[in-house]
């Protein structure tokens, strides 16, 4: 029988069919090799957009810098970064006029945050440029290394543990004539392996002291390391993203805190909220425009796209914005917030690993590090690379490129959103003073513009005026990539709007399935994903039930835990069958132990262990939840864990799921091969750091989360806490006198050791 596929959609409103257009099956593309070429592209492009600016030289580092601010007004439609200071300031003033007190209140909120934030805020985040080792490290390690170097150079403000004091150290470090750092290096030697009798390369790690003069230190402090952005779909070319070092991060954090506080108060801002809250906020703006245009006016919406948003933004412009926003605030606060944009005006982009050369005939490979690009003969490169290198050469210093204009990806998302909203805000009739007016939505570089006017000419005029106003502040709306529609149908940040936001369930497809963490977490994440999609993405009951059955099937194949009474043979089936036969209450067995699946769409919110607890045999309960089981290296599991789920589009999302600790919550051991590499010293530092943090958590468990405040070090805080707890336990009879005395003695010994060290 031939089925006409259009019949399937007779009962479905057209907008709900969006999930059938899903293009993203299969794995996203990942980048391999070096990101040097992409970074050079970014640097060269950014300079090209601002080429008519003024060149100056940084007196401290000798870096050539291009300043496009207040440059020539654009005469064509090419993207450009010539923002006009007075226009930006005026846009800020009008934004404040329409939202009285917005800047004042946000400054007060931020001031409170600045005074309370502790330096461990900087340990959040993944890879961070570690300036002491000149490469990327986990954030916690990079911070620890920075603090260690500061200490050994006599900077100790940070011992208080407040972020603001760490930033004082950063400022002081920039005035020092030289900074001494400890860096890791690798020695290789060829030795004969006793067992195989072959020659092998043995690597040993050394630590050596190195002095950096003021210029070298400043270059490192202002460096952003670059990497290639992975897993980007729908693009032919990869692009570079940046990761800043610890000197810049703290300052950026405070600026973004201020900008976030402003965005929260702006109805046109798509940040910092997300999900359903964001949809509700945006639907409001659309509703407002449609209600006002009902009878007499036309209303059109542009699904907007900006050309190279962050390469045309300029840190100097952000400095002007911050200066205006904080104009009535205390001097110290204004200074702290203005440092981030100043550092970005003087930033250096590290070019990454350099190029790899291969000689097919001689079977040789050699790496040309970025530092050599300034002097190497260009005859070895192909034409496009040669052009890139020639262009970037005047900007190179020590393997980094001076990059004053532009912002690099993902740095000031909130603040640039404030700038975008300030232009949307100018669309009110009292500012346009004509028959057309506009409003819209802005989320970082993505925007939707809604224009209302009595006729088509008015709509055109409104769009033109918006376009030109944007140009004045360095925003370039792309005429090629933006499209216009009657209001009611548009796309914004991958949300599709058609008389209301349409649930695009297919975007969530990649997050269905088995995550591969461990049996316990995978079961919990799997059912939580289904539950969340029923709540947020119109996943209907029948489809959810099917998704659940497919998930259980997938899970059983992944962990080879088919039901105990199945005919399927795997390498676990012998053990599982035995367990099945010995178990009295078979319904109590977890799916991962060959038990039946008791989940249906009504009980997805209950962790499997809790769901089956009453049904379990007593000895099975004892085995399952036994913290003393020697075969399990236990994570101490909070009641809620976070999983990273990958939607098809947009950034990885963090998702909470219930975690009940059982003997199935195992953690795979770390691969041993790392122990033979240059990472070993770092790994040991990291483990030491981890141990200290775990110990600290023991003394200040999150259930009693009163963080120790004040000027004590971690050790002092733990000792004083131990004394208080011991006294309470002794007085209430929980511990004996001898134990109490022993604890007090240990505390005194620790303090004595600390005194001797100092």
UniProtKB/Swiss-Prot annotation:
Domain RdRp catalytic, chain residue ranges per copy: 286-483
InterPro entries named among the record's database cross-references: RNA-dir_pol_NSvirus, RNA_pol_PB1_influenza
Region feature Promoter-binding site, mapped onto this chain: 249-256
Reaction equations catalysed: RNA(n) + a ribonucleoside 5'-triphosphate = RNA(n+1) + diphosphate
Region feature Disordered, mapped onto this chain: 50-82
Modified how: Phosphorylated by host PRKCA.
GO MF term (any one): RNA-directed RNA polymerase activity
Stretches with biased composition (Polar residues): 55-64
GO cellular component, one term: host cell cytoplasm
Subcellular location, record wording: Host nucleus; Host cytoplasm
Superkingdom in the source lineage: Viruses
Protein name listed in UniProt: RNA-directed RNA polymerase catalytic subunit
Protein's gene: PB1
